[in-house]
Every structure is written in C-alpha cells, then in structure tokens.
C-alpha cells in the first residue's frame, strides 16, 4: 500500500522509508546545554546514517506545578534555535501552545508540533495550518487512534496536508500510560497513510498521583522502543540528557545522552529488518 511522504527539507518521512529520528532535549535549559546535546545527536546520527531533526521546547506551558521550570520563552528560544541551525545545519522541531505563536515559530523552525493536550483546539490547528509548515500532531492520551483522522481533516481543511502523527501512549487508569501497538496501523489507515512516529520518552511517564512532577520508567526505554520500531514506523521521537537526574523536565523518562549511540544502533537494526519483510495481508 502506497505510503504518504512528508518532506522536511531534504529529509523524506514515510512509514516505508528508513526511520527519521526526532530527538534532543525536553526543554531548552540553557544555550550551552542545547549546543552540547545537539552536537552529540548530530555526531551520532551522521555516523549511523540516520536522518535527524533536533527537538526542544522553548516553553513548557503545560507543567503540572506553577513553580516548575518552563523554558526561556519565545524570543530567546528562537535565538537559540537559529544558532543551532547556523552551527550544525540541523532541522528543528518545537511545539506551539497559542495561535499567536504559530507563524513566528514557523518562520524559524522546520516542523511545528501540536501538543497532545491541545490537539483538538480548532483555533490553534487553523493557525498552525495557515503557516504551511510541516506539522507533528501528538495523539492525546485521551483520544483513540481512530479519532486522529478528524484532526488530520482539520489541517487539510486549513490547506495543509503536511502532517505527521505521533503516539505517546494512552491513559491506563490514573497516572499511568500504555502503548497500544495495534493503534499505529489504525492511525496510518485513518490519515491516508500519513507518516506515524512514536514518542517513546513521554510514553514512559508514570506520575506520583499526589506529586507535582512526572515520574518515569527510563530503565524500560529500550524495550518499549524496540517494540514500537518492530511495527514499522516513519520515525522515533526520543529525548536525552547528560544528567537525567538533574534535568529540569521529564528527567525520569530521558535517555542518558551517553547511551544514545548504542540505543540507536539497535533501533536502526530493527527498522532495517522489519522494512525488509514482504508486506503480508492477513485480512483475507
């Protein structure tokens, strides 16, 4: 079955092409740390021959606690992104939270991301669509895979069909997430075979029901990522940190930066194996 290709500059993203890595840090903690993390990702992905897009947030507007670190903000964040692009020649993805942010952010980065908690906000979707940028839609934890087609339709009605879908798990009772491996193919089907990627980092979240910050299951990142890659996906979304225990956001789910290369070697091997198989139709 023909898969839709979404192009991010010279990077082609599709479910039957070699996977694209969307990775970096959760939030911009500082200019120097962003440079360090981006350089490491670029070095490793170039060595392994993996197409790469750097990810970081300039504002974490959905933190649980009013006291949690949010990021440097729009103006300073865009300055850091511009320096990263000039220094490393890297593509960049970041999220927007308000309609007014869509165009200023799209003027700087290559992919704008619709956060899971905001994925049904029509005004935000319309503003993002109007930019003409490539869009990454995070599937809300409370939305079924089949409902993602409605969000894609909103973007198409807004004149933008350059949409990538991203799963980051589904609510499993209170304060826990699970990943439905059958949901990936449903998301492909309802979106006209748009590229589907897997955010393994945020799928590992598991919070203390009375705490102010998300916990995580970093020790299980490799096994969950292996399972997702075995489905046959367009890309993998993963955040890393040189010192996860002291990261300012989602450290418990972050891959230790030093483990990035061996981790990606495994992901690439699985991706190549699975996409080398003949497509088998078992529906009849």
From Swiss-Prot:
One of its GO terms (molecular function) is 3-deoxy-8-phosphooctulonate synthase activity. Its main location: cytoplasm. The keyword Secreted does not apply. One of its GO terms (biological process) is keto-3-deoxy-D-manno-octulosonic acid biosynthetic process. The keyword Protein transport does not apply. It catalyses: D-arabinose 5-phosphate + phosphoenolpyruvate + H2O = 3-deoxy-alpha-D-manno-2-octulosonate-8-phosphate + phosphate. InterPro entries: Aldolase_TIM (IPR013785), DAHP1/KDSA (IPR006218), KDO8P_synthase (IPR006269). Belongs to the KdsA family. This is 2-dehydro-3-deoxyphosphooctonate aldolase. It comes from Escherichia fergusonii (strain ATCC 35469 / DSM 13698 / CCUG 18766 / IAM 14443 / JCM 21226 / LMG 7866 / NBRC 102419 / NCTC 12128 / CDC 0568-73).
